Amino acid sequence: MAIDENKQKALAAALGQIEKQFGKGSIMRLGEDRSMDVETISTGSLSLDIALGAGGLPMGRIVEIYGPESSGKTTLTLQVIAAAQREGKTCAFIDAEHALDPIYAKKLGVDIDNLLCSQPDTGEQALEICDALTRSGAVDVIIVDSVAALTPKAEIEGEIGDSHMGLAARMMSQAMRKLAGNLKNANTLLIFINQIRMKIGVMFGNPETTTGGNALKFYASVRLDIRRIGAVKDGDVVVGSETRVKVVKNKIAAPFKQAEFQILYGEGININGELVDLGVKHKLIEKAGAWYSYNGDKIGQGKANASNYLKENPAIAAELDKKLREMLLNGGNGEQPVAAATAEFADGADETNEEF
């Protein structure tokens, strides 16, 4: 229904007054906002980039990555840092767990000489550092490892055994309110790593929950559940982990998709193995028996040899990566290489019993 002329004049006057008082762009028609096309940073995993629907993690937003111990949470965030640094972006790592290994980070491709790192004493200090870096407008990616290690000052100064009900949840809730707008204005990606706890007395449904209350769940644009589902072996020697990531929440594309990839010890995500698997699935790589061929040329017998060929020929790997991204991310007709999660997972994934 068309708005009558008087209402249009009144609306135009109101919009003019708002823009005069709060600045241009403070209010706009949703269809006119071209900035809705969100800039993203690759996760280092092609299948996860595709599962996210936009080609990576969104800039200017909050992301939560959670899972059990040794599931690959920190590795995934270090791969994000490496990808961001390759694009010339500035990154910071807030190491609240005091457990960051610079040698391992360097092996994953992180430029440790240009990585800002802080090991804060309290949770409040960590979040204030995040806010200061964000307001500077000069930092593109901030990692907080982890929410569970963001200990409130009152708890640190108190005695072991003292009750501090809801302190961490209140601290996180206040920080989210303060950070969300600044992150959008600075176009900074803030990633929180989180741990899993078990809810006591749950008879039905998922007993797992994450630490830090409900605020992070609400403010996060993307939530990723990462799990180790098996071992990668070279003969009898375990050389890595089979990893599955489920997109529990996604505000920039369809949620509840999942991706599977390998994390090799000392190397990180096996991107070349992903290229082989996705290339075969989408008929860019031919597979005859145990042999793999690309553009008519044999590239190896067995997946491991084909992956090594791509590792030794980065130009071919980059070409294959580009073709797959164009096919699967830019409106191509290729079949989506990610499976929808079950309804049971979707219903139970966001449950929590912590105070807001």
From Swiss-Prot:
InterPro entries: AAA+_ATPase, DNA_recomb/repair_RecA, DNA_recomb/repair_RecA_CS, P-loop_NTPase, RecA-like_C, RecA-like_N, RecA_ATP-bd, RecA_C_sf. It is found in: Cytoplasm. One of its GO terms (cellular component) is cytoplasm. Pfam families: RecA, RecA_C. Its main location: cytoplasm. GO terms for biological process: DNA recombination; DNA repair; SOS response. Keywords: ATP-binding, Cytoplasm, DNA damage, DNA recombination, DNA repair, DNA-binding, Nucleotide-binding, SOS response. ATP binds at G67, P68, E69, S70, S71, G72, K73, T74. One of its GO terms (molecular function) is ATP hydrolysis activity. Can catalyze the hydrolysis of ATP in the presence of single-stranded DNA, the ATP-dependent uptake of single-stranded DNA by duplex DNA, and the ATP-dependent hybridization of homologous single-stranded DNAs. It interacts with LexA causing its activation and leading to its autocatalytic cleavage. Belongs to the RecA family. This is Protein RecA.
